[in-house]
Amino acid sequence: TPGYNSFDEVELIHSSLPTIDLDEVDLTTHFAGRDWDYPFYINAMTGGSAKGGEINRKLAQVAEACGILFVTGSYSAALKDPQDSSYRVKDLHPDLLFATNIGIDKPLELGIQTIEETQPLFLQLHVNLMQELLMPEGERSFRNWQGHLAGYAKQLPVPLVLKEVGFGMDAGTIQRAIELGVRTVDISGRGGTSFAYIENRRGGNRSYLNDWGQTTVQALLGAQ
């Protein structure tokens, strides 16, 4: 449903007897092998075009100024075109907390190349099954995904994050990822950017799949 976000239905429980003082409130969190000042970050969205590069540079500027982690969209376009500069934000923002991502269909050597070229704090490996199915040029072979994931988890020189792209990650997938060596997952559920909607607007004809997947709240509850 356009405009719907599952977090709108979440109500916080009021507690009348606090156990800490206000100045003891601590927002720091730990994931992907390190501590972070905030429990949120600017997640992967775009890249691979002039407009995408403009958006990435603006987001990187904000992220650096605020001390927030910024993740670029899939680096796959730059792997095909070495002249692609839409992901090169560290040169302009040397203090930026930076990470990037590529698709799980990419073999380990391309993941290593991505790390060498971008020097991220971690690498997201994204799973986008429904998006691929809706893309006329999308992947149709998925048997190698789990093998790729196991290789990344074992050999990657930086922390690995297995990332959904807005369809939610179910408990079975999370459990299988753990068995393959993954220690950090991004369950990104329905309610934000919809790549099903984007692909259907781009020329697809399966609008009945625009709302496919679990919401982020459903995915969070399922992951407990």
Show the residue positions of the predicted features.
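Active-site cofactor/substrate anionic-group-binding motifs, chiefly glycine-
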Residues: 30-77
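Active-site mouth loops of central-metabolism enzymes
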Residues: 41-53, 99-109, 161-170
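Hydrophobic faces of well-ordered beta-strands that scaffold small-molecule active sites
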Residues: 40-43, 68-73, 96-102, 121, ...
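Phosphate/diphosphate-binding glycine-rich loops and adjacent basic-rich segments that engage nucleotide
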Residues: 120, 125-152
